[in-house]
Amino acid sequence: MSSSSAAALGSDDGCSPAELRPSRYESQKRRDWQTFTQYLAAHRPPLELRRCSGAHVLEFLRYLDRFGKTRVHEPPCPSYGGRSPSAAGPVAAAAAACQCPLRQAWGSLDALVGRLRAAYDERHGRAGEPDAVAGAGAVATDSTSSSSAAAANPFAARAVRLYLRDVRDAQAMARGISYHKKKKRRGGNMNGARGGGGGGARAGVNDGDATAPPVAVTPGLPLPPLPPCLNGVPFEYCDFGSVLGGAHGAHGGHGGGGGGFYGAGVYLPFLYNTFS
């Protein structure tokens, strides 16, 4: 079909030629699938796609290493681990004459496996299966078919994932980098550690008040008389509680909850050391 006829066909359908052209991802996925099918046809003995497993995918990935362009240094090499030797000296000459093998980069292999997995699902996954029987068992049939299709996909095998992880770790060690992320510390624990050193007795009182259940005290009850030995002793206000009334409650004053009979914040200045 000529370009003019293709343009005319696109105009009749209401779609421009740019919209009919497949995306770069789709084109690359189609080329990768053709390469894999050619590899299966050239395999000795010839291998059918329905008999393909994760082990055959690993053979295909190792076969692609022949055409790799990423030099992966090995432990005897001076450049192993990301070390850059100086410009002069025998170490630099040995690094220049490095004979480490060329491999496929981990990122290229990971993207290739992802495209082939998607291509397999399009051709032999749920798209190629007959429709499930409508009715009450339709949902169960769909879930069963999707799980069986995922299990039958050789590019989604666990061995392939482990191989990609090993390739990533080996190339990371050769380059002297790490893909492991550091664990972030929680901000709440750090703030608590910073504020835990100070506070003293006041912090202890506030913590006790926050966890203590409220005490229901009937309002309007008359206060009991003070002991005879405390007659004439002046009372003052204190933020840290009451010697007679106990800890500082949520509501201060006479009859307040959690403040005792004589209210929160009342103490005896002359007898403070005696009672404490």
Curated annotation (Swiss-Prot):
Q: Which GO terms describe its cellular component?
A: nucleus
The record, for PANTHER family, names: PROTEIN G1, PROTEIN G1-LIKE2
Molecular function GO terms recorded:
DNA binding
Quote the biased-composition stretches of kind Basic and acidic residues, using this chain's numbering. Answer: 21-30
- Its name, as the record gives it, is Protein G1
Indicate the principal place this protein occupies in or around the cell: nucleus
- Looking at the keywords, is Transcription present? yes
Tissue-by-tissue expression: Expressed at the empty glumes of immature spikelets, which are lemmas of the sterile florets located at the lateral side of the spikelet, throughout their development.
Question: What keywords were assigned to this record?
Answer: Developmental protein, DNA-binding, Nucleus, Transcription, Transcription regulation
Null phenotype? Answer: Enlarged sterile lemma in florets of the spikelet, caused by homeotic transformation of the sterile lemma into a lemma. Elongated empty glumes, which mimic the lemmas and have the epidermal morphology of lemmas with four or five vascular bundles.
- Outline the extent of the ALOG domain: 24-183
One GO biological process term is: floral organ formation
In residue numbers, the region (Disordered) covers: 1-30, 178-213
Superkingdom classification of source: Eukaryota
